[in-house]
From Swiss-Prot:
Keywords: Membrane, Phosphoprotein, Transmembrane, Transmembrane helix, Transport. It is found in: Membrane. Belongs to the major facilitator superfamily. Proton-dependent oligopeptide transporter (POT/PTR) (TC 2.A.17) family. The chain crosses the membrane at residues 44-64, 88-108, 113-133, 153-173, 195-215, 223-243, 339-359, 375-395, 420-440, 457-477, 493-513, 541-561. This is Protein NRT1/ PTR FAMILY 5.6. The modification Phosphothreonine is found at residue 112. The gene is NPF5.6. PANTHER family: OLIGOPEPTIDE TRANSPORTER-RELATED (PTHR11654). Expressed in stems, shoots, leaves, flowers and siliques. The lineage of its organism: Eukaryota, Viridiplantae, Streptophyta, Embryophyta, Tracheophyta. CDD domains: MFS_NPF5. It comes from Arabidopsis thaliana.
Length: 575
């Protein structure tokens, strides 16, 4: 009985420690174990969400009107403008792969956010200067046709500085925000599930403000005034983020995340001829008390050949300590390598969705320019059509969080309602519907080009709204999937993987436009992409994309069914 009482007391002490302290290897601002009541959770996340709002405000204030700027101020033709938008969008959303790597391996997420946001701010300052300094200002449209070279150079340097800033800001900030919630604490784990939804509500609020207030200022007042506003808001949010420093929980960078992956492959190949042990528990693993830099993972049968990296050749404790990490690795390191391999097919099978998403900021906006934008006595700025997407996203996320998740949870017994990959797949179906609607509307618009009165821009409302539903399911699902399904030490890179879907899709979109354009000219003698929309056949391109997405959904279903989820060993307090 005494032994049982002692055991119960130890468990109670462990539980009490978990309630008081955060024991997930994070640190407070002074390098100590964080006190749960004073750090992290929503008290810290709100500071982080504030800077995300301002970053999305700045990004979409520029991105949604970029094609308009290139075709009107810089006088680029449609194909050149779309290519430049896609190149910039591609670089902006691929740069997080580098930023996430630097954050996880060397600088840490907090420091990376500070450095990246400073670079972002430099880009905004240069952009604003290019509209006010006489030597850099664009020439007036009525005075000259050719754009002023100095302005063009300053403009592109500025927007690519913003790309570099986004590269460090986006993956680090979102993963830093999620780090404020302890996965081993029941209440905080529930909060974390809500965090990604409310993160996206804040993101949408930034987008909504950008495509209404900022777009109106750019359209009616001037790009320079809009630049001043965006620069000031970003500077204020950086100060707010810095003020939250005492409340944050920090994770120390763990070195290059690529080295352990390479070590697993080298060790598995070196021991390829050894037999598998009779029981997975015989594979090399450290105890929970020894492992303080993260969480231990459970063994999975998937990619079993990599298990050989954890086969113990000499069970002598002294020999184990001296064993090279290129010869023997823990089971957790092996499972982390499997996780990286698992996300690769998911990444590829979501690229078609990314291609659909890129249309909203390019061709959808260009369609709006050619249509009647008068509603009552008000002229709608083209970029303000994104208001419908942002509102749909906010409403659908709120309904999903407050109504659908509790309902689905009671049916499926899954804390998320449905699993992450099911959520992603649902959004892909909405993206298919978006392309079908867009094709039908564009055909209707082309049929009316000979009429004196153009179609109302309201006809574009359905495609802007349905893509909002697609984003609510797929984009948010991708954020959760890549954050949770990569090793804990690679979470900034995990967010970068999600962003890189859009980045790679932007470049693929350019390749598709070029390939489809060439094929159309060879077979029919007429390009699908003329100098303007009225001389193009954008409806056919949309039907082509609908076919690509439909085929991709079938591939995604097959991949998703075979893809296992991360399996974490319960902590001592929870077990």
């Amino acid at each position: 009985m005494e032994h049982k009482n002692i055991g119960a007391e130890v468990l109670q002490d462990t539980y009490d420690d978990q309630q008081k302290w955060v024991l997930d290897s994070s640190l407070d601002s002074r390098g100590r174990v964080p006190l749960r009541a004073r750090t992290g959770a929503w008290r810290a996340a709100l500071f982080i969400i504030a800077i995300e709002f301002s970053e999305r405000l700045s990004y979409f204030g520029l991105a949604t009107n970029l094609v308009v700027y290139l075709t009107t101020i810089l006088n680029q033709d449609l194909k050149m403008a779309i290519r430049n938008v896609n190149y910039w969008s591609g670089v902006t959303t691929l740069m997080p792969l580098l930023g996430g790597f630097i954050a996880d391996a060397y600088l840490g997420r907090y420091a990376t956010v500070l450095v990246a946001t400073t670079i972002y701010l430099m880009g905004l300052v240069l952009l604003t200067m290019s509209w006010f300094i006489p030597g850099l200002k664009p020439c007036h449209q009525e005075v000259c046709v050719e754009p002023r070279k100095a302005h063009e150079v300053a403009f592109f340097i500025a927007i690519y500085l913003i790309s570099i800033g986004t590269g460090g800001h986006k993956p680090s900030l979102e993963s830093f925000g999620a780090d404020q919630f302890d996965d081993d604490h029941v209440e905080e784990r529930k909060m974390k599930m809500s965090f990604f939804n409310w993160w996206n509500v804040s993101l949408c609020a930034g987008i909504l403000t950008a495509v209404t207030a900022v777009a109106y200022i750019e359209d009616r007042v001037g790009w320079g005034v809009a630049g001043i506003i965006l620069t000031v808001v970003m500077a204020i949010s950086l100060i707010i983020f810095f003020i939250g420093k005492p409340f944050y929980r920090y994770r120390t960078p763990s070195g290059s995340p690529l080295t352990p992956i390479l070590q697993v492959f080298v060790a598995a190949i070196a021991k390829r001829n050894l037999p598998y042990p009779s029981d997975p528990s015989l594979l090399h693993e450290v105890s929970k008390t020894e492992f303080t830099s993260g969480r231990l993972l459970c063994h999975t049968e998937h990619l079993k050949f990599l298990d050989k990296a954890a086969i113990i050749e000499d069970k002598n404790p002294l020999a184990l300590e001296k064993q090279s990490p290129w010869r023997l690795l823990t089971l957790t390191k092996v499972e982390e390598t499997k996780l990286i391999i698992n996300v690769i097919p998911i990444w590829f099978s979501t690229l078609a969705f990314g291609i659909c998403a890129t249309q909203a900021s390019t061709f959808f906006i260009k369609q709006a320019i050619t249509m009647d934008r008068h509603i009552g006595g008000f002229t709608v700025p083209p970029a303000s059509m994104f208001t419908l997407t942002a509102l749909t996203l906010i409403i659908s996320l709120t309904v999903y969080e407050k109504l659908l998740v509790p309902l689905l949870r009671s049916i499926t017994r899954n804390q998320r309602g449905i699993n992450i990959l099911q959520r992603i797949g649902t959004g892909m179906i909405f993206s298919l519907i978006t392309m079908i609607i867009a094709a039908l509307v564009e055909k209707q618009r082309l049929d009316r080009t000979n009429n004196n009165k153009p179609m109302s821009v309201i006809w574009l409302a359905p495609q802007f709204m349905v893509i909002g539903f697609a984003d609510a399911f797929t984009l948010v699902g991708l954020q959760e999937y890549f954050y949770h399904q990569v090793p804990d030490s690679m979470r900034s890179l995990g967010i970068a993987f999600y962003l890189s879907v859009i980045g790679a899709a932007s470049f693929l979109n350019n390749l598709l436009i070029t390939a489809v354009d060439t094929l159309a000219e060879n077979f029919s003698g007429k390009s699908w992409f003329g100098k303007d929309l009225n001389s193009s056949r954008l409806d056919r391109f949309y039907w082509f994309l609908a076919g690509v997405i439909a085929a991709n959904i079938c591939v995604f279903v097959i991949v998703a069914k075979r893809c296992p989820y991360k399996s974490v060993q319960p902590s001592q307090g929870l077990s």
